Amino acid sequence: MINIRKTHPLMKIVNNAFIDLPTPSNISSWWNFGSLLGICLILQILTGLFLAMHYTXDTMTAFSSVTHICRDVNYGWIIRYMHANGASMFFICLFMHVGRGLYYGSYTFLETWNMGVILLLTTMATAFMGYVLPWGQMSFWGATVITNLLSAIPYIGTNLVEWIWGGFSVDKATLTRFFAFHFILPFIIAALAMVHLLFLHETGSNNPTGIPSDADKIPFHPYYTIKDILGAMMLILSLMLLVLFTPDLLGDPDNYTPANPLNTPPHIKPEWYFLFAYAILRSIPNKLGGVLAXVLSILILVLVPFLHTSKQRSMMFRPISQCMFWILVADLLTLTWIGGQPVEHPYIXIGQLASIMYFLIILVMMPVASTIENNLLKW
């Protein structure tokens, strides 16, 4: 008798994705982040669901409903902090996952890569709207500043912003719709992630060498299931350390003050995972230029496959490209730091330099480095 997992219509899908999936035998821990992102998403949906049971999406009661969750609901505090810090873990895994794709040339799987870029943008939108929901000072002013950027779009900008706000300022209508979108988007992300996986399984995984691994494949279970479980345990351990010891480490103290449209906080800044884009946005003196630069800072990922000039797929055997990659990482860390600093000398100049470097490395220096390596190898 043939095993039920290979014949049953539903079990067959699970089997082909997680059990009998032929996987390269040499993929490293950098390949763990895909499954970790899945775990993060499930965790966020579950904690978010329980938070939504007690949250009220109304300007008058939103802030106090979050306080009520933390003080009066059984284990509400841990659910709230797991959700808030879970978002940070989500983005750490996202950045690692994208970085892995850049380093090992996984972006040559075009459909999978473009689907991933869409997933990244959707997740960023979801996180932004979630940050607005507690209705603290930074929630309100963050929402005001970021939505206001759309007014830079010529001709339709002002109408577009007022349409998104549902009025002439960020108010009741804005909060209600942001809650609705924040609730629905994670389920859309889950569906998109399935499509992402579907595209990946059409080609099979890449591996650190970038060389086709058809000659040396092993079953996903038990080898990589056990490896994913180890990764998951490390993820949950680090999340719980954050939640139980320093839950407010990555948050903004201003968000413990209820939203007040009459009082602007001295430094308006988003959560840490948006700071690199925020720094790029601020580094251009022109409003529309800044908005375009910030959007392109993410959309530039779509161009990466077309800028691949190397004869090798992975950077594993390309030391010059490796240097470029790590300079890019350092540049992104610099941008993240600058995004959290006030707009004054010397931060302005550093931010502008780091922003120019970011685009220069991806658009010019990396393709040039690849061409140099090709010539050195006489390819």
UniProtKB/Swiss-Prot annotation:
Its main location: mitochondrion. SUPFAM superfamilies: a domain/subunit of cytochrome bc1 complex (Ubiquinol-cytochrome c reductase), Transmembrane di-heme cytochromes. Gene3D superfamilies: Cytochrome Bc1 Complex, Chain C (1.20.810.10). Binds 2 heme b groups non-covalently. Coiled coil: none annotated. One of its GO terms (molecular function) is ubiquinol-cytochrome-c reductase activity. InterPro entries: Cyt_b/b6_C (IPR005798), Cyt_b/b6_C_sf (IPR036150), Cyt_b/b6_N (IPR005797), Cytb/b6-like_sf (IPR027387), Cytochrome_b (IPR030689), Cytochrome_b_C_euk/bac (IPR048260), Cytochrome_b_N_euk/bac (IPR048259), Di-haem_cyt_TM (IPR016174). One of its GO terms (cellular component) is mitochondrial inner membrane. Pfam families: Cytochrom_B_C (PF00032), Cytochrome_B (PF00033). PROSITE patterns: CYTB_CTER, CYTB_NTER. It is found in: Mitochondrion inner membrane. The chain crosses the membrane at residues 33-53, 77-98, 113-133, 178-198, 226-246, 288-308, 320-340, 347-367. Heme b b562 binds at residues 83, 182. Component of the ubiquinol-cytochrome c reductase complex (complex III or cytochrome b-c1 complex) that is part of the mitochondrial respiratory chain. The b-c1 complex mediates electron transfer from ubiquinol to cytochrome c. Contributes to the generation of a proton gradient across the mitochondrial membrane that is then used for ATP synthesis. The cytochrome bc1 complex contains 11 subunits: 3 respiratory subunits (MT-CYB, CYC1 and UQCRFS1), 2 core proteins (UQCRC1 and UQCRC2) and 6 low-molecular weight proteins (UQCRH/QCR6, UQCRB/QCR7, UQCRQ/QCR8, UQCR10/QCR9, UQCR11/QCR10 and a cleavage product of UQCRFS1). This cytochrome bc1 complex then forms a dimer. Heme 1 (or BL or b562) is low-potential and absorbs at about 562 nm, and heme 2 (or BH or b566) is high-potential and absorbs at about 566 nm. This is Cytochrome b. It comes from Arabitragus jayakari (Arabian tahr).
